[in-house]
Each structure stands twice: as structure tokens, then as C-alpha cells.
Amino acid sequence: NNELFLNLKTISNSSQDDLTFFSNEKYLNDLKKIKAKACIIENKYIKYLPSHCSPIIVQEPYLALAILSNIFKNQNVQSNGIISDKAIISPNSKIYNNVQINAFSIIQENTEILDNVYIGSNSNIGPNVLIHKNVIIHDNVSISNSIIMENCEIKSGARLGGSGFGFEEKTKQKIFHSGNVLIKKSTSIGSNTTIDRAVFDSTIIGENSNIDNLVQIAHNVIIDDYAIIAAQVGIAGSTKIGKRVKIGGQAGVAGHLKIGDNVTIAGKSGVTKNILDNKIVAGFPAKDIKLWKKEIIKNSLK
């Protein structure tokens, strides 16, 4: 009916001109007292809606929310095409069209920045960096020896492309890292996350992945597409992680392992062995979550 919605809000904070959503039975009491004009909701819950709130019936409310959030968002971070006179640009770099570089950022040699890139203040880009179109790089980021594909977002304080924690075991001789980091398209890297360059080849983060804040990804790690990795996760060197893997906060993954597709690793888990496709693991050492739960129950009864 061509209704106008001013905001997308949570149920408890919504008002008469807002759109909200319901996806969790824990908030059923809030649903009954809702003030919003309309609610994204599954059909089985519409009986709890007050008469003034119109239902927008979907099968997956949270997915609908994710899509709508991008319609409602205020896109205030996008390039205006202005390079600050306080930025430092190497003559051996190449900058394409409509690139914004804010004050005190440094673009080093052998760096190429393609169209419509935004770079915040006090960031250090290069050397040996290629940034593709429509990338957003926030303040205080450092990127070296890296390729960032299109439509990625690198949040404040991230560190990409530094040398990894590699040395010979007996003598502690440092191993020189000559590889790089590759961030594939439409991936988000959280604040203060560190991704080390490979020893020889590439440390790779797959496309459409979401890496949270304060994550450590070591040299030669390969993470396939659609990964979701929560804060304070550490992944040791040369581990390979499959598609659509989810890793909970503060989990640790040992080096030189293979984690299959569609794996879920619960928060605070310690992964010491390979994990097959479609497994859900928890605990230390990480094991099938059903076994882990049985052990927790057994120990609690002692």
C-alpha cells in the first residue's frame, strides 16, 4: 500500500513509523507489545501481532532482515574522488579514477589502486599492493604485499601482509617471507585483525567471507568462500579451511590441518586434528559436539 517506513528497528525499540522483525521466541512478549507499523515474521507467529502492526510474512525473517538492512543503511563511506594534500603518494604508485585518500595516509611504491576506492586517514598502503574497484579501507590500516579484490571492506586497525611467525625450530633462524595475501571479492576484514603474508605463495581469504575483529590468521592459511570467523580466533600456519565454515569466538586451530566444508567449530574450541565435511565440533581437544555434550553432562554428575 505504498507505506513509508522511517527506520528498521528492533522490536523493543521500534515506534509507529518503523519496520521491525521477529525471529526468536525469546522475544515473544516483546512481539505482543510491539509498536512498529509492520513486522517481518513467519506465518506461525502472526497470531501474536497486535492489530495495528501489519505482518510481512517470510520463511526466513533473519535473511529478509539482512537484505533489507542494506536498503536502509546510510552509505556514508564512499569515495568522493578527493586525494588530500596531506596524503603522501609515491611517484611509483598508480591511482585510477574517483579514488579518495584522506589526510596522513601513505601510498608506497609498486602500489596500484583501481576505481572508486576509499582510503581513510593515517593508513599505510604498500609496497607491493593491488587494490581492486569499490574497496573501502578505514582509518589506521596497514596493507603490504597484498591483493584486495573488488567490493571488500578492511576495517580500522587491520594489518595485512606482514611477515609471519616463521623460524627454524632448532636454531630459531627467522624464515624470510616473500609471499603475499589475497583477499577475494566481497569480503570483510574486522578491526585489528592480522593476516600474515605467505612464505612463498599466498595466504588466501575466500570471497564473501566475514572475518571479525581481533582475528589472527597465520602464513599460508587458505580459507575458502563464505567463511564466518568470530573475534579472537587464531589459525596457525598452512591450515586449509573449506567452504562455509563457521568458527566461534576464541577458538584456536593448529597448523597444517585440513578443515572440511560446512564445518562449525564452537567457541573456545581447540582444534588439533583434521575435521571432515559437515561436522560440528566443540571442546579441547575438539571433538564431535554430541560427544562433548555427553562428557560435560557426565562430569557435572560426578
What is each model feature region?
Residues N1-K86, N151, G157-A158, G162-K174, ...:
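Terminal amphipathic alpha-helical/low-complexity segments used for targeting or macromolecular assembly
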